[in-house]
């Protein structure tokens, strides 16, 4: 809730199904999911696919500012073929995206922030590779919980007229500080 009139566009690529584009919209306090498009089967871990989807969204939903949340598995700077192909970002089936490919898939200077809901993406190697992609990068240097970031609490902060990234970080920290599951 509290999207402040903004557009929350979701590229969703569930395992075993073709990707789809969704819009999450709030009307009179009610959150609605609107199906925008089905894509043909494509490799979502391909930088050309990423760039194409971002370009499509930006052209269809012009805005004064953009943020990007990337959710997947992440293993920072280690190459994608290291130890069972588990060292990169963005899994689609058996395909993984190297960090330099991720940088190729993201346009320069478009995003106010990139938030990684993925493990290990706050390394200096990752942030350096993505240095021209966003003003701010929010990420964890270690594992993140499978439940992901507390989006219900963070959405008002991400969609505020005055972007509240410090509060997003505090919300993330406090959420996991106060949540003992699964330990």
Segments the model singles out, each with a brief description of its role:
Residues 76, 83-183:
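Terminal, contiguous helix-loop blocks that mediate binding/assembly
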Residues 1-69, 74, 78-103:
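Divalent cation-coordinating acidic motifs and surrounding scaffolds
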């Amino acid at each position: 809730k509290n999207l402040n009139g903004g557009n929350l566009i979701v590229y969703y690529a569930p395992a075993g199904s073709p990707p789809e584009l969704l819009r999450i919209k709030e009307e009179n306090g009610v959150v609605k999911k609107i199906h925008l498009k089905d894509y043909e089967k494509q490799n979502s871990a391909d930088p050309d696919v990423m760039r194409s989807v971002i370009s499509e969204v930006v052209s269809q939903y012009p805005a004064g500012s953009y943020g990007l949340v990337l959710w997947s598995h992440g293993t920072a700077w280690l190459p994608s073929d290291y130890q069972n192909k588990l060292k990169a970002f963005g899994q689609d089936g058996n395909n993984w995206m190297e960090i330099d490919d991720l940088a190729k898939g993201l346009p320069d200077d478009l995003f106010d922030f990139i938030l990684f809901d993925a493990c290990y993406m706050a390394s200096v190697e990752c942030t350096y590779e993505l240095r021209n992609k966003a003003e701010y990068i929010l990420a964890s240097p270690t594992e993140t919980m499978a439940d992901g970031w507390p989006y219900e609490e963070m959405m008002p902060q991400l969609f505020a007229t005055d972007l509240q990234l410090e509060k997003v970080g505090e919300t993330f920290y406090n959420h996991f500080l106060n949540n003992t599951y699964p330990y």
